[in-house]
């Protein structure tokens, strides 16, 4: 991501968090929607513009073809010392799309490293092209309330990103992250 766009994104993150002090930063969804949504999050046109960045759209097109629609966005902003964990899951478990011909684009606004809870994934878990069994999570200190029922966490790899880098993953990829302990 170009430096000027990254600076604008950081300013938009700060603004979005400041405008919604009653919502944990990890739960700010729909930032691309300046008209609000069911969670009463009022986003901004700037986020919609970020999501339409031509170089990112071109990468997505290479993976899923030219028929692209942005239907959701999520800000995973994990404050130091108390940022929520994201249990192991597949995006396809949550997404209301059929068929699941979609991807997730992650944009690192700040460094996303193991020490501050970067995304982790299970290599090859997307290859069967199916959603595995998930179970309800009782804990309240997590960003989502379902997790993969059976998993060998020893296979996990970090998806560390530096500010301005992006990562794209498949809807079937098993992934999650720990809380921010930095």
Map each language-model feature to its residues.
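Short, intrinsically disordered, charge-balanced linker/junction segments flanking boundaries
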Residues: 1, 177-182
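Non-heme Fe(II)-dependent double-stranded beta-helix
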Residues: 2-97, 134
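Residues that flank catalytic or metal-binding motifs in active/ligand-binding sites
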Residues: 43, 71, 101, 115-117, ...
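A structural signal for well-ordered alpha-helical scaffolds and beta->alpha junctions
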Residues: 53-57, 102, 137, 141
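A short, structural micro-pattern
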Residues: 69, 99-101, 182
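Short, conserved beta-strand element in jelly-roll/cupin
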Residues: 89, 96-114, 160-163, 168
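Double-stranded beta-helix
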Residues: 112-178
